Amino acid sequence: TNLPADADQASPTSAEIVTATQDGMTLIYSDSPDKSVGFVDIADPKNPKAAGMVRLEGEPTSVAVAGQKVLIALNTSKSKVDPGGVLLTMDVAGKAIDKSCDLGGQPDSVAVSPDGSIAAVAIENERDEDVNDGAIPQAPSGWLTLVTLADGAVTEAGIKRVELTGLSEVAPDDAE
């Protein structure tokens, strides 16, 4: 387990989205139920070792490595009708948050371009399954956020919102 010794070992956890550092020696995963990001040392792949975890102030939905940083899509929504989220930049070696960037909606996933210069964040603003049996459309709609990166870090000036409404024949007002 990757939980600290003083944590309830029976608490629910889940290594949902997994990424690897550029050297391939460390796995980093989002743990939504525990509101944390975990690290696994795989320098010896036959003997992986827990390498710690960092608790967060929200639900991590996705992780992606950019250079020596890990980008964390963090759901901070107050409710389904008041979605919120941030993109965190964490130094991999020090496991410390360097930056937080408001995304304006509930992120679902993050991916980094092969050259490490752009992160794409899918803003889902997930629907409420209890409303109208979860049928779409449901406001607010989602979108794509493109973020310019410099050495793996988010640059506030380089944030671009790309609307996705109107692209689908089914529920064109809801890009979820």
Where are these regions (language model features)?
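Beta-strand-rich domains and repeat architectures in extracellular enzymes and scaffolds
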Residues: 2-37
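Beta-propeller blade signature
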Residues: 83-94, 136-152
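Short, conserved, GDST-rich strand-edge loop motifs in beta-rich repeat architectures
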Residues: 73-83, 122-142
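Blade-loop segments of beta-propeller domains
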Residues: 44-77, 103-104
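A short beta-strand motif characteristic of beta-propeller blades
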Residues: 1-10, 46-54, 96-101
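Surface-exposed loop and turn segments in beta-propeller and other repeat-based domains
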Residues: 1-9, 55-56, 151-176
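Residue-level detector of Asp-centered blade-edge/turn motifs that repeat once per structural unit
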Residues: 22-24, 65-67, 112-116
